[in-house]
Amino acid sequence: SAIIKLEKSSGEIISSKTFDLGGSDAFEHIVEYQNELIAVGYNNAIDSQNTFFTEGQATISVLNKTGNLIQTKSLNEYLAQAYRIEVYNNYFFVCGLSDEANDYVLLKMDTSLNVIWSKRYGGTQSDHNFGMDIDLEGNIFLTGHTLSDTENWDTYTIKINLDGDKIWESKVGNPRGFDPKYIHDETWDVKGTNDGGCIIVAGSGDEYENYNAYCDSNGTSSNQWVVYLIKFSESGKVEWQNIYFDSEGGDWAGEAITLTNDNEAVVAVDNGSFGFLKINSF
């Protein structure tokens, strides 16, 4: 596991520290809380070459502001890979993947790292949780992708209250209208919006040598991956969905999203290196 502090304006490395938490291990996400850093991730991973689901054992760690490790606690009783952590009203909310990546898992913890409750969400097939956000009103949004009751991987987004009760869920995919059996819609991040809804970012495309189709409306091939954004209303209705792509045919996939004060979206894009996409206010 590693923690790297950067100078914000230049990107220069201020400090870098690594920690051996046991076997193949990593921090996946980190937040600040009362002059400490709280990081979640995993250790003792079986699949050390995989960065999506490593078949590891979930952990939560506390570090001081200078990056020195204070303690690490196992969360493996509840989930295999902790992927995101948020702070709300002096509680920690941790989400990630269950054993064998079958379900989304959400934990509510106190600041002494005691688990108050654990909830699972999903269907009968694989449900992979990679994104979480909590809005100012305390609405929790989880997102990722699912094979439950879908023809292939579709985006899977859930709105949850602070007691862990599901308010709504939505599965959406295949924005270009291809044969859904061949299309992967893989979601990586979510941000709550000020209207009680949320916006998710995904990548959409196919990974099959025996399938290749073209979208008449924009000329893209199913083999060309695109950035895929979906805006949900407060009640879970899809308000709009758009794709964004490389006009020269390269692959793009949305990996992370943040919202500006002007209600614009900035998306981190996997384009074979590292890119950014800015979306006008919506």
Predicted ranges, named:
Residues 1-282:
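A sequence-level/structural motif corresponding to short, flexible coil/turn segments enriched
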